[in-house]
């Protein structure tokens, strides 16, 4: 029995997608949940797994096609004698011989004595024209070689559906939201020591080390419980600020297709270990094109890690309609003055950008100090 592989809705509001890869051929065997296509939407590039097992008898689309919800992309099951997609013609080899020849142009240049009136200057033949014939009338015949024009080729980059969506979202955010930005330098010395002491335990119990980023996200979540306005969004239709009950922390992930921001759902209920596991899981799914739109929707605040690229400070752009984005920079060892002399401390640059329409710089300052307190005093950051 033949089964139709249809393009189904993989997320809220999705109506179509662009086929970017076809991972199987007609005649191949495929298993249930094995990827058959890669499709790009305006929010994500994701694999489409097969809901059926069997032999692929037809593939009805090609790379570059835009498919709509319900469209039959392939047939799995009984083999058909004639595939639904015509095979691509094989290119023929042609050998062309091109002869290049330089064209010589012979022209006459009439030179008058009046052209050289100063200091008795007379025209002299250069080596390039010394064999030309000079007439008594001062006519000079010069043989010149025409040089081919050099052409500078320009390269173009096609804008993907996802890149276009990113551009539109960033432009919208930058145009609508006036940001206030503050940077804090947080003493993460105790956190560094604590992380080093528990990573062996975490590796043996959870098969993973706990990243600094997981601790930072947990500290931000803790601080949001005291400053919920930074976990809010503005509703222009009702002209009111909506305080979100859940803290869904968006994690900026750098992928080949561009920046993807999946979010950790209900982060306020998770431990440091659970947050660390969620970060790894979402990043892997994003980079292997297995992310779902449900992972991207309903974020309430975003966090980005400048430190992963060695950067300390930057100006992050808020993801509209969120209220805030927090950026963590590269950890640095600094010599600082202490009560009994000097000491080496581990310093975390922490940057907060917030919507200045609804919060002031002083609010951002208090929020930043609370995050710093959570990190410096290791409040609720233990690994159990």
Swiss-Prot record:
The protein's Enzyme Commission number: 2.3.1.12
Family annotation (InterPro entries): 2-oxoA_DH_lipoyl-BS (IPR003016), 2-oxoacid_DH_actylTfrase (IPR001078), 2-oxoacid_DH_E2_comp (IPR050743), Biotin_lipoyl (IPR000089), CAT-like_dom_sf (IPR023213), Single_hybrid_motif (IPR011053)
Active-site residue list: 356
Positions of the Lipoyl-binding domain: 2-77
GO CC annotation terms, alphabetical: cytoplasm
Cofactor info, note text: Binds 1 lipoyl cofactor covalently.
SUPFAM superfamilies named among the record's database cross-references: CoA-dependent acyltransferases, Single hybrid motif
The reaction(s) this protein catalyses: N(6)-[(R)-dihydrolipoyl]-L-lysyl-[protein] + acetyl-CoA = N(6)-[(R)-S(8)-acetyldihydrolipoyl]-L-lysyl-[protein] + CoA
PROSITE patterns xref list: BIOTINYL_LIPOYL, LIPOYL
Top-level taxon of the source organism: Bacteria
Subunit structure: Forms a 24-polypeptide structural core with octahedral symmetry.
Summary of the function given for this chain in its UniProt record: The pyruvate dehydrogenase complex catalyzes the overall conversion of pyruvate to acetyl-CoA and CO(2). It contains multiple copies of three enzymatic components: pyruvate dehydrogenase (E1), dihydrolipoamide acetyltransferase (E2) and lipoamide dehydrogenase (E3).
Name of the protein in its database record: Dihydrolipoyllysine-residue acetyltransferase component of pyruvate dehydrogenase complex
Gene this chain is encoded by: pdhC
């Amino acid at each position: 029995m033949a089964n139709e592989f249809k393009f189904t809705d993989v997320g809220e509001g999705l109506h179509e997608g662009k086929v970017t890869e076809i991972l199987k051929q007609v005649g191949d065997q495929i298993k249930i949940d094995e990827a058959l296509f890669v499709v790009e939407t305006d929010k994500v590039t994701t694999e489409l797994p097969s809901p059926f097992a069997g032999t692929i008898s037809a593939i009805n689309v090609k790379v570059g096609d835009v498919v709509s919800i319900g469209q039959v992309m392939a047939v799995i099951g009984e083999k058909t004698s004639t595939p639904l997609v015509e095979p691509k013609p094989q290119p023929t080899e042609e050998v062309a011989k091109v002869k290049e020849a330089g064209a010589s142009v012979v022209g006459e240049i009439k030179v008058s004595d009046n052209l050289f009136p100063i200091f008795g200057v007379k025209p002299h033949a250069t080596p390039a024209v010394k064999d030309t014939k000079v007439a008594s009338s001062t006519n000079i015949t010069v043989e010149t070689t025409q040089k081919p024009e050099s052409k500078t080729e320009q390269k173009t980059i096609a804008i993907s559906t996802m890149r276009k969506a990113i551009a539109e979202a960033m432009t919208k955010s930058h145009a609508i939201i006036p940001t206030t930005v503050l940077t804090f330098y947080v003493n993460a010395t105790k956190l560094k020591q604590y992380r080093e002491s528990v990573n062996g335990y975490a590796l043996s119990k959870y098969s993973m080390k706990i990243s600094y980023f997981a601790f930072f996200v947990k500290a931000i979540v803790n601080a949001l419980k005291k400053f919920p306005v930074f976990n809010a969004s503005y509703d222009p239709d009702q002209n009111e600020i909506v305080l979100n009950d859940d803290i869904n922390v968006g994690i900026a992930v750098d992928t080949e297709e561009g920046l993807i921001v999946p979010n950790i759902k209900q982060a306020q209920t998770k431990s440091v270990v659970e947050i660390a596991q969620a970060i790894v899981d979402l990043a892997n799914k994003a980079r292997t094109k297995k992310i779902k739109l449900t992972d991207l929707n309903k974020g309430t605040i975003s966090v980005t890690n400048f430190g992963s690229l060695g950067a300390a400070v930057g100006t992050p752009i808020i993801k509209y309609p969120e209220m805030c984005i927090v950026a963590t920079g590269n950890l640095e060892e600094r010599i600082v003055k202490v009560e009994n002399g000097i000491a080496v401390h581990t310093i975390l640059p922490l940057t907060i950008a917030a919507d200045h329409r609804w919060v002031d710089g002083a609010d951002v300052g208090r929020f930043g100090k609370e995050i710093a307190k959570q990190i410096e005093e290791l409040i609720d950051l233990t690994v159990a």
